[in-house]
Amino acid sequence: MAALHTTPDSPAAQLERAEDGSECDPDQEEEEEEEEKGEEVQEVEEEEEEIVVEEEEEGVAEVVQDAQVEAVAEVEVEADVEEEDVKEVLAEEECPALGTQERLSRGGDAKSPVLQEKGLQASRAPATPRDEDLEEEEEEEEDEDEDDLLTAGCQELVTFEDVAVYFSLEEWERLEADQRGLYQEVMQENYGILVSLGYPIPKPDLIFRLEQGEEPWVPDSPRPEEGDIVTGVYTGAWFWTDDIEDHEEEDDEDFLAEVAEEENEPPGLWSAAYGVGDVPGTWGPDDSDSAQTPEGWGPDPGGLGVLADGSEAKPFLPGREPGANLLSPWAFPAAVAPPAGRPETTCDVCGKVFPHRSRLAKHQRYHAAVKPFGCEECGKGFVYRSHLAIHQRTHTGEKPFPCPDCGKRFVYKSHLVTHRRIHTGERPYRCAFCGAGFGRRSYLVTHQRTHTGERPYPCSHCGRSFSQSSALARHQAVHTADRPHCCPDCGQAFRLRADFQRHRRGGGCAEAGGDGPRREPGETAAAAGPEDTDPGPEGSEVGEADGEAEAAAEEREEAAVAAPTPSGKVDPAPERRFLELGNGLGEGEGPSSHPLGFHFPVHPKSWLHPDSFPILGLPDFRERLPVDGRPLPAPLGGPLSLVEGTGLACDPFGGGGAAGGGGGLRAFGPAIGGLLAEPAPAALAEEESPWICSDCGKTFGRRAALAKHQRYHAGERPHRCADCGKSFVYGSHLARHRRTHTGERPFPCPECGARFARGSHLAAHVRGHTGEKPFVCGVCGAGFSRRAHLTAHGRAHTGERPYACGECGRRFGQSAALTRHQWAHAEEKPHRCPDCGKGFGHSSDFKRHRRTHTGEKPFRCADCGRGFAQRSNLAKHRRGHTGERPFPCPECGKRFSQRSVLVTHQRTHTGERPYACANCGRRFSQSSHLLTHMKTHRGATAAPGSGSAPAPAPKPEAAAKGPSSAGPGERGSALLEFAGGTSFGSEHQAAFAGPSGAYREGVL
C-alpha cells in the first residue's frame, strides 16, 4: 500500500486513512497548501487532456465528425448515467467514510467508453513532459479506471457494435490515408481489448475485412437518426443489420401497409401466425434491437443464407468456414440469458434482453402502443423515427436509389437490390425441395407453399384461404365491391392500382386520347367488367422481370389444385364471372384441411357466364366449327363459356352477339379439343391488358410475358437439354424436363409416401386417397379427379375425336387410345400372350387380355356381387342398380344408360344405316343385324357336299371403310367400340347436339 502513496492526499491515501480511522494533520495551513497543490495538478491534467483531445479531433476529417456526433451523444449519456450508478454503489460499499465531495471528485475523473476509445487514440500522441509525481498519479488513476471498466463489464454485456463506427463509400473516399490507417488501428485495437477482457463476442465482419486487407466501408450506409447508432448483430454466418429498409417488400405501398398493419396489431400476432417476430425482419416483437431465433432454427438447407424472416443476409465471405459459428451460444446475443443484477435491460412483457436501457425503452413503446413520431402530412404515428422518415417518402416522391444499369429509381434500397437481379440474372433463393431458383425471397416462400400446402391468409367473410396476401386482397374486393382507383378522364373504376395503371398507360381510355372503348355518360363503373387480372408477383416495380415471375407462376399452375367446394355453385357475385377451379372452400366453410390445398391461378381464359351454355344445343353447331383459325359468326345464340381444354370461347358479359360488338369467336385448331380461343375484344378492352401479340392477338399484362410468348411464333427455343438435346421455350420447362433424366421426384405423397416429379401429378394422386372428384360433367353429372379426364369424357357427348391415326385414318377421343392403337401398326409387340401367342404393344392391353384366359374378374359389384374383368363394364353394370341414364336423346328426350345404345337409337331419327352387306348391298342400322343377315348368305353359298367352307364374312371394319358404307347425304355414326376392341362405323362423326346448357366444367 505504501508504494501507492505517491502524493500525500492521493485517493488511495485518503481511503487508507478513512479505514484506519486516523485523524487529519493538525497543521491546517499545510493541509490547505496540499489541497491547493492537488487542485493545481488536477487543472494541469485537465488542460493537457483537453489539448490531446483537440489535437486528435483536428486530425480527423469533418465527415468523420458528422458520422459520429449523434452516435457519440447517446453512448456518452448512457455510459455516464450507468457508470455514475455503478460508481455510487461501489463508493458506498468500498468507501463508506468518504464524503460526497470526494466521491464526486473521484467519479468525475472516470472516463466514458467513448472517452476511453478516444484515449486509445490519444495514447499515440507524444506525451507532454511532466514531473514524476504527476505521471505516477495519472498511472494510478488509469489503473482505477480499468478496475471500474472491469466492474462495469461484469454488470453489462458489451458488444463490438457499442464502439464500432461505419463509413459509406463516399465518406470513406473522403478520408486521407493517415486517417484511414488511424481508423483501422483503432477498430482493431478496440476489438482486441474486448477480447482480452473475456467478452464472448465473435469476430465482426468489419474486423474480418480489415484482416483480409479489404476496405471496410458499408454500401449505402444510412445516416443514423438522432440518438441512435447504426448497429447490427453478427450471427456467425451473416451480418444481420436492423435497418428497416433491408426488408424485402413487394412495392412501396404494400410495404407501408404492412408497417401500418404491424403497428396496429397486438404483440405476438406475427409470431403466432408465421413463427417470426412482430415486425418484419426480426425473430422477436421488435426489429430495432436484437435478433432472436426460434427453437430449432439452423442454417439454410441450400447453404445460400436465406433467413426465414425475410431480412437481408450476406453470403459467406471467402476464407471463412461456412456455418462454423452459426449455432454457438454467442451467435445470438439477444438470446443469451440476462446478466445477473441487470433486470432493467430485460423486457418484463416478452422477456427480450437489450444491452442498454435506452433500447429497452424504445422497445417498450410497442407494448405500450406509444407512437411519438407523427407525420405532419397525414397524421400517421410511428414508433421509430426511421419508420417516419421512410413513410414520408410517399408524400415527397423521393426515390434516392437509382439503378446504374437502366436508371430506374426506387424508394427502398432493397428494391434496388432486387431489381438489379433482373440485369444480372441472379437467383440467390433456392427451393430445398425441387431446386427452383428465385430472385426474391418472397417468391421462394410463396413457391414453397406449393410443397407444404400452406394457406396462411383466410378471408374473414367466407373463410376461404389463400397462399398469398395479394390473392386475398383481390378476393376481398368481391365482398366489398370497392373500386377505389377511378380514372379521372373516363370515370372507369378499378379494384387494383396495377389495373388502373395499365388502363392509363395502355391507351384503353378514349377520353385520354387512347383507342379504347368510350363509355356512355350514364354507364356505371361496375359495368366495366371484372378487373381481376393478376398483376403478377413482381408488383409495380419489377414488372419486367425476366424469369422470376415465370418460375413462380408456372410452379403454381403445375400444382394448381385445391380442396373442392361441395356446393358446386358458381360464385354468385356478378363481378366474378370467371371460373375458378379448386380455389379452396365454398361459402361459409372454415379453412381448408386439404394437404395440398393450392390456389388455382385465375387465368384470363377462364370466363364462365353464370347463366346457360346453349352452344351445344344448336342444330348446326358442327357446321359452324372453324377450320384453321377462321372466325366464327358472332350471333351463336347468346352468352357462351370458355371451357379450358375444349377450345370454346365467348363474350363473358353476354355481349357476344353482333349488337354487342363482340367481334365473334376465334378458334385456333381443326378440332374442339385442340382449340384455345381468346375472349372477345370487348372483354380484352375491359381487362386493360396493353401488350398484344401481333401474330395471334393474345394479350398480356407484362411486356416480358409477351416477349416470351412470341418465342412460340418465332420457333425460338433457347433452353436446350444437355442430355438429350431437346429444346424448350421456358427455362422452367427445361428444369421440369431434367427430372426425367435425373429421376428426381420432389413431391412426396403425405399418405403413402409415393413421390412424383410434378406437383399436379401428386395432387391428382392425393385425390385417389380422399375420393375427391372436383371436375363434374354438366351433362350427366359424372365426376372426375382430373381435368383431362373430364375433357376426354366431354368428347363422348360431343362425338369429338381429335386424334387421328396417320396409318389408317382412324380417329380417337383420347391420345392414350391413339397411342395404344398405333402399336397395332407397329411391328414391335413386346407383350405376347403365352397361351394364344397374341402380341400386344401396351402392357395394359396385355393384362386385360390375360383375364380372358385366367377368368379373373377383379371388379365386383357391391350390390349383387357380380364380377367383371374390366372396370368400365362394372361402371355400366352399376347403372342398372342405380337407374342412372346419363345419355339423353336430343330429339325425343329418351335417356339411355350407355352411349352406344344412344348412338344406335339416334339412327332411328336420322335414318342412317351405316352397315352394308358386301354380297347384296342391303344396309342395316346395327352391326348385330348385319351379322344376322350374313348368316343367310353363308348357308346359301355353301353347296351340299362340295366340301368347300362357307365364304368368310367380310370384316366389319373393311365394310365400314368402303365407299358404300354410307349412302348419299348420310354422315355416318360415331365409332361403336366393343369390349373386345372391335370398332364399327365410319370415321365421320354423327351430328350430336347436347341439350341446352348441357356441357360445362363444374366444381363440386
UniProtKB/Swiss-Prot annotation:
There is a cross-link at residues 829, 955 (Glycyl lysine isopeptide (Lys-Gly) (interchain with G-Cter in SUMO2)). GO terms for molecular function: DNA-binding transcription factor activity, RNA polymerase II-specific; sequence-specific DNA binding; zinc ion binding. The modification Phosphoserine is found at residues 10, 112. A zinc finger (C2H2-type) spans 345-367, 373-395, 401-423, 429-451, 457-479, 485-512, 691-713, 719-741, 747-769, 775-797, 803-825, 831-853, 859-881, 887-909, 915-937. Keywords: Acetylation, DNA-binding, Isopeptide bond, Metal-binding, Nucleus, Phosphoprotein, Repeat, Transcription, Transcription regulation, Ubl conjugation, Zinc, Zinc-finger. SUPFAM superfamilies: beta-beta-alpha zinc fingers (SSF57667), KRAB domain (Kruppel-associated box) (SSF109640). The modification N-acetylalanine is found at residue 2. One of its GO terms (biological process) is regulation of transcription by RNA polymerase II. It is found in: Nucleus. Residues 158-229 form the KRAB domain. InterPro entries: KRAB (IPR001909), KRAB_dom_sf (IPR036051), Znf_C2H2_sf (IPR036236), Znf_C2H2_type (IPR013087). The keyword Transport does not apply. Residues 1-148, 508-574, 936-976 are annotated as: Disordered. Its main location: nucleus. May be involved in transcriptional regulation. This is Zinc finger protein 316. It comes from Homo sapiens. The lineage of its organism: Eukaryota, Metazoa, Chordata, Craniata, Vertebrata. The gene is ZNF316.
